[in-house]
């Protein structure tokens, strides 16, 4: 039995809002390069006081999307030497998979921490 097994699950509503914090990054398809940050930021700001789990997962989603945006900008600069485009595809696929995993874990009530993420928002 781990310490995490002893912690009670967040409420269903809190789990759903935490999941939506992660999945709101798909606003990237509507507004490239800003939608992925705006979505989690709005959801987190509206619901962070609802439950500590939503606050934690909202910060995690926002930090990952900020990191993703910075990495995509770097890939854009590297496009001048032709390596940026394949890196953009790779980074996008990895980000998509990680966001889906994070959303599933949040819906299960398990906290998720993204790998390779700068935690700019504390």
Predicted regions and their residues:
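Residues at secondary-structure transition points
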Residues: 11-14, 33-36, 48, 52
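Hydrophobic transmembrane alpha-helices of multi-pass, membrane-embedded glycosylation machinery
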Residues: 39-44
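Juxtamembrane transition segments at transmembrane-helix termini in multipass membrane proteins
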Residues: 94-122
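Amphipathic, cytosolic membrane-interfacial segments at TM-TM junctions
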Residues: 47-69, 104-113
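Low-complexity, intrinsically disordered extramembrane tails and loops of integral membrane proteins
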Residues: 1-14, 115, 119-122
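Juxtamembrane loop-transmembrane helix junctions in multi-pass integral membrane proteins
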Residues: 9-12, 16, 56, 79-82, ...
């Amino acid at each position: 039995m781990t310490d995490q097994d002893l912690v009670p699950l967040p409420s269903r509503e809190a789990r759903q809002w935490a999941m939506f914090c992660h999945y709101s990054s798909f606003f990237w398809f509507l507004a490239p390069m800003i939608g992925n940050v705006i979505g989690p930021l709005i959801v987190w700001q509206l619901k962070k006081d609802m439950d500590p789990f939503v606050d934690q997962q909202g910060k995690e989603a926002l930090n990952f999307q900020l990191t993703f945006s910075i990495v995509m900008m770097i890939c854009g600069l590297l496009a001048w030497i032709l390596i940026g485009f394949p890196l953009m595809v790779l980074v996008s696929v990895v980000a998509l998979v990680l966001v889906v995993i994070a959303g599933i874990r949040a819906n299960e009530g398990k906290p998720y921490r993204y790998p390779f993420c700068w935690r700019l928002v504390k």
